Regions:
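Short glycine-enriched loops at secondary-structure junctions
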Residues: 115-119, 172-175, 229-230
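Short, small-residue-enriched loops and turns at beta-alpha junctions
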Residues: 46, 174-177
């Protein structure tokens, strides 16, 4: 009875937190693709979380996500719950997916079956996504319980046989990578054999890893950011302060499981976390152009004026970049979410004195750095605000 009372209180608190405000993440579609928002690493009561699978669906819908994969620990971590009598030894490791899929379908949320292989050092943790049967993966891994490296390889081999998309989780987790983020010997072998499709560059508990970002570029892996939450969403995210969970942005041809998989295989992903965007240059240029719309452009003898409108949940921080010293415009400014900024470009004589705009000029590009759009470790996106008559 005491446990039921505690659960009831938690549900009431959770409901009241959700009733406080809607914090839907708004990211516009980019040219040629739909921008889908997903979380591909999160836990429930079926491993070491304390949230029911259907609640994970409701949280995702409430926050405006399009994709969710519940990735409970399917092997070693689950034994704690077996020992405590919460689940049985022969528990179906696909249960979280089965419990959540009906509500997800009714809610328009794409639900992907997945799990987390959780081995001790030096193997680490790995997510298997788009799997058909987690039980078979566990069975293969647990044949080598006395050797974590062999267990990981066996589990991932079975996952790959099922057509899984495999993500190396939180390589910068201090417990497994004290003081320095490196590719360990086990991961080197797995990389060489082509087991990894992605790296979790941003983790809700560990934050951002610049090293992992650059590894994704070097080894042609998808750039992923996931919450890895174990408790209720409202206990992890300061919604009152305007925060949101970390999400992976998937640039897909349409909203479908098949299209999401195609986009992830093609590495068309990015991360939105802590008011930052992390990804590849190609996708981030498209995303910037979609987020910042240039409106009310006026050409005159003194130059160009316009309104820059931010139509996204991403605050955009801009600084002037080299290459257009013959024009004067703001060196540094921020366009908050869903707001506008008056922007002007004025010609300079000898890079110093204002002058009239040459009427023969038909095209101007104002070079900028987007300081919170990173295309590599500590490397902001360089692009331009373009004007053409």
């Amino acid at each position: 009875m005491k446990k039921l009372t505690s659960l009831f209180v938690m549900l009431l608190v959770s409901a009241s937190a959700f009733a406080y405000t809607s914090n839907k993440i708004v990211i516009p579609d980019v040219e040629g693709y739909k921008t889908l928002k997903g979380d591909f690493h999160i836990h429930t009561v079926f491993s070491d979380g304390n949230v029911w699978p259907e609640t994970r669906v409701r949280e995702a819908v409430w926050e405006g996500l399009d994709i969710l994969s519940i990735t409970d620990h399917i092997d070693t971590r689950s034994r704690k719950w077996i020992k405590n009598g919460i689940i049985s030894d022969d528990c179906d490791r696909n249960t979280p997916y089965k419990l959540a899929r009906k509500l997800a379908a009714r809610s328009g949320l794409l639900l992907i079956n997945g799990g987390e292989l959780s081995r001790r050092r030096p193997s680490g943790h790995t997510n298997v996504l788009f799997v058909k049967d987690n039980n078979k993966i566990v069975a293969e891994a647990e044949k080598f319980d006395n050797d974590n490296a062999k267990a990981t390889k066996a589990g991932l081999t079975e996952a790959r046989n099922q057509g899984a998309f495999i993500m190396w989780n939180h390589p910068h987790w201090e417990k497994y990578a004290p003081n320095k983020t490196v590719i360990g010997p086990v991961q080197k072998k797995l990389l060489k054999k082509g087991f990894f499709d992605a790296i979790e560059v941003y983790n809700g508990g560990c934050g951002y890893s610049p090293e992992a970002h650059d590894w994704c570029l070097k080894y042609n892996l998808a750039i992923m950011g996931c919450s890895d939450y174990h408790g209720p969403l409202f206990m992890n995210v300061d919604y009152k302060g305007g925060a949101h969970r970390v999400v992976t942005l998937v640039f897909a041809k349409e909203k479908s499981i098949k299209s999401v998989r195609e986009a992830m295989d093609a590495k068309r992903t990015a991360i939105f976390a802590d008011d930052m965007i992390y990804g590849r240059e190609q996708e981030l240029k498209l995303l910037f152009d979609a987020c910042i719309q240039v409106k009310d452009v006026k050409w005159g003898e003194k130059g160009i004026s316009c309104t820059l409108e931010n139509v996204s949940s991403v605050p955009v921080r801009i600084t002037k970049a080299p290459g257009t010293e013959k024009y004067r415009y703001n060196r540094s400014f921020i366009i908050p979410p869903f707001s506008t900024f008056r922007f002007s470009v004025q010609p300079l004589l000898d890079g110093n004195t204002s002058t009239k705009l040459d009427p023969s000029v038909k095209k101007i590009e104002a070079n900028i750095f987007v300081e919170n759009f990173h295309v590599g470790a500590n490397k902001p996106l360089k692009t331009a605000i373009k004007f053409e008559k």
